[in-house]
């Protein structure tokens, strides 16, 4: 058995962590580019052969082991559109999104100069096209919102072992999905959530 002293010493050195098994962490950059005196949001269209093909998103991706979220966002932006990390001015950490499918997405709002934007080199394996959309559009226009109700239905669970009935009422929730449309470009889901929060 542990003594009181041993327990105190153990917990003095104990480092708390979020209890998130099999959890994935991502980071995105929300790039702002000033052109003709107006600030624009830089968005990507995902390549047709990768996951979520054709969706509109920010530069970003999975965080490598031991990598700070901001460094991951800058690295992904460099890999996807060729802008050196030294030419990206991070203005602030944006919102953090916690998804129902075991993932967390960090966001960082940054400014990219018009000169750097002019030297962009698209990585075609990941990005099909780039868009510049006036920031004022998101400030002045609310997205459409669709609500999707979700619930847990666990059939293969040891109900007898934990002492609850098979018709146990698991937690339910409602997912609110925003959708923007600008000049034929449809932006929805997590990208739209970040934009709606930032512009509001």
Language model features with spans:
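Phosphate/pyrophosphate-binding betaalpha-module
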Residues: 123-125
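Short aromatic-enriched loop/helix-cap "lid" or pocket-rim segments at secondary-structure transitions
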Residues: 143-145
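N-terminal leader/linker segments that precede catalytic domains of diphosphate-processing enzymes
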Residues: 1-57, 62-79, 83-119, 136, ...
């Amino acid at each position: 058995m542990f003594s009181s002293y041993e327990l105190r010493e153990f917990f003095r050195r104990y480092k708390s962590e979020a209890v998130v098994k099999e959890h994935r962490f991502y980071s995105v950059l929300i790039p702002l580019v000033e052109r003709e005196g107006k600030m624009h949001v830089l968005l990507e269209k995902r390549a047709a052969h990768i996951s979520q093909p054709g969706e509109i998103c920010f530069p970003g991706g999975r965080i490598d082991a031991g990598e700070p979220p901001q460094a991951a966002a800058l690295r992904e932006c460099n890999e996807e559109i060729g802008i050196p990390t030294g030419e990206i001015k991070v203005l602030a950490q944006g919102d953090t999104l916690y998804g129902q499918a075991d993932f967390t997405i960090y966001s960082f709002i940054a400014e990219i100069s018009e000169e750097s934007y002019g030297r962009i080199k698209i990585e075609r394996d990941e990005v099909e096209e780039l868009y510049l959309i006036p920031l004022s559009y998101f400030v002045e226009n609310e997205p459409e919102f669709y609500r999707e109700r979700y619930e847990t239905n666990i059939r293969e669970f040891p109900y007898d072992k934990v002492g609850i009935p098979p018709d146990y009422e698991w937690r339910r929730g409602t997912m609110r999905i925003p959708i923007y449309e600008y000049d034929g470009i449809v932006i929805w889901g997590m990208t739209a959530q970040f934009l709606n929060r930032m512009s509001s």
